[in-house]
Amino acid sequence: MSQNIVPKSAYREIMLSGHPMMDVRAPIEFNKGAFPSSTNLPLMQDSERQKVGTCYKNKGQDAAIALGHSLVNGQIKQQRVEAWLEFISLHPNAYLYCFRGGLRSQLTQQWIKEAGIEIPYVEGGYKAMRQYLIEVIDEAPKQSPIHILSGITGSGKTDFLLQRSEAIDLEGLAHHRGSSFGRYHEPQPSQINFENNLAVSLLKHQERAEKCLLVEDESFLIGRSAIPKQFYSGMQAADMLVLEEPEGARLNRLLNEYVHKMHSGYVERLGEEAGFDAFAEYLSQSITGIKKRLGGQLHDEFQSIIANALNIQRQRGDTQPHMEWISLLLTKYYDPMYQYQLDKKQSRVIFKGSHQAMHEWLDEYSSKG
């Protein structure tokens, strides 16, 4: 590796190690997508970048470079260099990158060097690293067999996945549980960040040399995060494992996920009153999201039961009344929908069983030559 340039051959190690990187692109570029270990410390802010870009189109590169120097000068330049130096002091082995590994990387590197510090920039920049991660995702179905973990709503698929080293939690990466009630407290990542995080997870999975890749049975969209097409095609052709769980355990799990966790999460973020109001709105909006499938009359019945359960919870702190609408949700919506979908995939099912039986089956599968 050249002292000042990190070659493309290092991309895999960068992603696997979570190597700290300084992204000097403008915030608007960074917010569309970046890498898990990167921090945005821009050479130019959005408005400055826009002016330089317009100048480049109208007057060419030399004029654009001159304008860039005039916009990022004096105290502004000093503040940005100081921010870079502070980052490097915290991460002495850091790399930097811009969009293509061109002028912005070179100029940033030069200014930092003038302050007495050497920092390498990544060859090809964001664009080349992003392309590398896209290829990782597209090639993943060929790297190891995919097994799809299915199971009726509330069967604990995510809990199970988190206990398995061969698993990747797609819903965790998407910050969404993949259903009408599936949103998290924090917003979903951008599509690019979802894909980049998936690619890094796949690289780590490959590094562990697992016998298979275990992922949950998902729709193409998890909330608003789209599973990349090549990877999703691999999932659609994969063998399936069906996790089975008694109804009582399913109800308790959904009460915990939809009520206890969501309520406490909103209260933690917003305070007692505003948090409860946000939690109530989450339940109401989630039912409204499936109104067309439920039908108007059943939707209204759900809203009435939920409103009553919320009133009791607010007054007495008792969450058990929520069990009524959760049970109804299973029998009238989730269970029939799941059975319909599973019937279409029966030919792909290779094992069904409880949590313990599923662990034993996968352990045996992994131990085979």
Curated annotation (Swiss-Prot):
Its EC number is 2.9.1.3. Coiled coil: none annotated. Keywords: Selenium, Transferase. GO terms for molecular function: transferase activity, transferring alkyl or aryl (other than methyl) groups; tRNA 2-selenouridine synthase activity. The keyword Transferase applies. It catalyses: 5-methylaminomethyl-2-thiouridine(34) in tRNA + selenophosphate + (2E)-geranyl diphosphate + H2O + H(+) = 5-methylaminomethyl-2-selenouridine(34) in tRNA + (2E)-thiogeraniol + phosphate + diphosphate; 5-methylaminomethyl-2-thiouridine(34) in tRNA + (2E)-geranyl diphosphate = 5-methylaminomethyl-S-(2E)-geranyl-thiouridine(34) in tRNA + diphosphate; 5-methylaminomethyl-S-(2E)-geranyl-thiouridine(34) in tRNA + selenophosphate + H(+) = 5-methylaminomethyl-2-(Se-phospho)selenouridine(34) in tRNA + (2E)-thiogeraniol; 5-methylaminomethyl-2-(Se-phospho)selenouridine(34) in tRNA + H2O = 5-methylaminomethyl-2-selenouridine(34) in tRNA + phosphate. SUPFAM superfamilies: Rhodanese/Cell cycle control phosphatase (SSF52821). GO terms for biological process: tRNA wobble uridine modification. Residues 15-138 form the Rhodanese domain. The active site is at residue 98. NCBIfam families: PRK11784.1-2, PRK11784.1-3, tRNA_sel_U_synt. Monomer. Involved in the post-transcriptional modification of the uridine at the wobble position (U34) of tRNA(Lys), tRNA(Glu) and tRNA(Gln). Catalyzes the conversion of 2-thiouridine (S2U-RNA) to 2-selenouridine (Se2U-RNA). Acts in a two-step process involving geranylation of 2-thiouridine (S2U) to S-geranyl-2-thiouridine (geS2U) and subsequent selenation of the latter derivative to 2-selenouridine (Se2U) in the tRNA chain. Belongs to the SelU family. PANTHER family: TRNA 2-SELENOURIDINE SYNTHASE. This is tRNA 2-selenouridine synthase. It comes from Shewanella sediminis (strain HAW-EB3). The gene is selU.
